[in-house]
From Swiss-Prot:
Pfam families: tRNA_Me_trans, tRNA_Me_trans_C, tRNA_Me_trans_M. Belongs to the MnmA/TRMU family. Gene3D superfamilies: Adenine nucleotide alpha hydrolases-like domains, HUPs, Translation factors. Residues 163-165 are annotated as: Interaction with tRNA. Keywords: ATP-binding, Cytoplasm, Disulfide bond, Nucleotide-binding, RNA-binding, Transferase, tRNA processing, tRNA-binding. It catalyses: S-sulfanyl-L-cysteinyl-[protein] + uridine(34) in tRNA + AH2 + ATP = 2-thiouridine(34) in tRNA + L-cysteinyl-[protein] + A + AMP + diphosphate + H(+). Catalyzes the 2-thiolation of uridine at the wobble position (U34) of tRNA, leading to the formation of s(2)U34. It is an enzyme of class 2 (transferase). GO terms for molecular function: ATP binding; tRNA binding; tRNA-uridine 2-sulfurtransferase activity. This is tRNA-specific 2-thiouridylase MnmA. Disulfide bonds join 117-213. The lineage of its organism: Bacteria, Pseudomonadati, Pseudomonadota, Alphaproteobacteria, Rickettsiales.
Length: 368
């Protein structure tokens, strides 16, 4: 059966039995199959799981990197036959991801903690672990492809577009890509389930992790615990500054939101902006949410775009993509993206990821 699931060699100049691979294991089906597949292909596999939160027993069911998932990862490693280590990264994760999540909401923005986690914890620190252990590559179960052409490494969308995770990996650097490998990018999720059963993994039918891993309650309750000031009452105003009502905390709102405003009005109202300086939620009609111009900060380019380059951009993970043009700005490490067509509800704090065909050329964080 393995002949049906051929992958590119992890290293072109080393045979599998000479290649040491660290596999980041979350306890889910994907990373477990990645590890089992490489082991069965003859690679020297070492599984590593990061304990990111939940040592107090409060991990949410269906999350990753905590609680039962850590035991699942260890059990898979033991049943297949390769070593597995658990590293406690709770303090780093709390500072770099959880606190950033709350602070981003406090700035009136909508965060993507999965990108921050990859950027500041999983890739940065696990790559260092990979080097410390004298391994050749770091492998993950992400649905994304890494292609080498003419000595250049490219990050590309997965074959399975319904599972593609390239949006969440836009902050990956060229240096990191040299050591990273994504063996599942050329397969469909259904293939991975088949492989899990073939390898006899007890987690073959385990559901995919859903939502933000460390949020055990609602977003608002989680953030309220981290930043109590986020639930202070304030005014709801229209785009002209007229007071329309009162809100129970900016944490309960995000740009583009319609539900939960509790305001009687002659037309539907949406959240246009969250003004954190005076604790106001600004609302308005749908046309006030339509825009073409986006300012992007903290840029990471895997391929430097030319001035006026035409690309496809994704403005949220579920976005199919919009045609756009990229321009430089006078501000350092910022870019201006002009969409061909108006887009609804562009949210500061989300990522703007640029593609050239299937290739991720980079992106940044939306300012406005």
């Amino acid at each position: 059966m393995l002949k049906e699931f051929e992958i590119e060699p992890l290293l072109k100049d080393k045979a599998p039995h000479q290649t040491k691979a660290i596999v980041a294991m979350s306890g889910g089906v994907d990373s477990s199959v990645a590890a089992a597949l490489l082991y069965n292909l003859g690679y020297e596999v070492i599984g590593v799981t990061l304990q990111l939160y939940g040592s107090d027993g409060n991990a949410r069911k269906g999350a990753c990197c905590a609680g039962q998932d850590i035991y699942d990862a260890k059990y898979v490693a033991e049943s297949v036959g390769f070593p597995h280590y658990i590293l406690n990264y709770e303090e780093i994760f709390k500072k770099e991801v959880i606190e950033d999540f709350a602070n981003t909401y406090m700035r009136g923005e909508t965060p993507i903690p999965c990108v921050r986690c990859n950027q500041t914890v999983k890739f940065r620190d696990l790559l260092q672990v990979t080097k410390n252990l004298g391994a050749d590559v770091l492998v993950t179960g992400h649905y994304v492809r890494r292609l080498e052409e003419n000595g250049e490494v490219k990050l590309c969308r997965s074959i399975d577009k319904s599972k593609d995770q390239s949006y969440f990996l836009f902050a990956t650097t060229e240096e990191q890509l040299k050591l990273l490998r994504f063996p599942l990018g050329g397969f469909y999720k259904s293939d991975i389930r088949k492989l899990a059963k073939y390898f006899g993994l007890q987690i073959s039918e385990k559901p995919d992790s859903q939502d933000i891993c460390f949020v055990s309650e609602s977003y608002s309750k989680t953030i309220a615990k981290l930043a109590p000031q986020s639930v202070q009452k304030g005014k709801i105003v229209d785009i002209h500054g007229k007071v329309l009502g009162e809100h129970s905390g900016i944490v309960n709102f995000t740009v583009g939101q319609r539900r939960g405003l509790c305001i009687a009005h002659n037309e539907p109202l949406y959240v246009i902006k969250i003004n954190t300086e005076n604790n106001e939620v600004v609302v308005g009609p749908i046309n006030a949410l339509m825009q073409k111009k986006i300012l992007v900060k903290e840029l990471n380019w895997l391929e430097q775009p030319k001035e006026g380059m035409e690309v496809t951009v994704k403005l949220r993970s579920s976005h199919a993509g919009s045609s756009a043009t990229i321009y430089s700005t006078d501000e350092k490490n910022k870019a201006c993206v002009i969409l061909n067509d108006d887009y609804f509800g562009i949210s500061p704090g989300q990522a703007c990821v640029a593609y050239k065909g299937e290739q991720v050329i980079g992106g940044g964080w939306i300012c406005s």
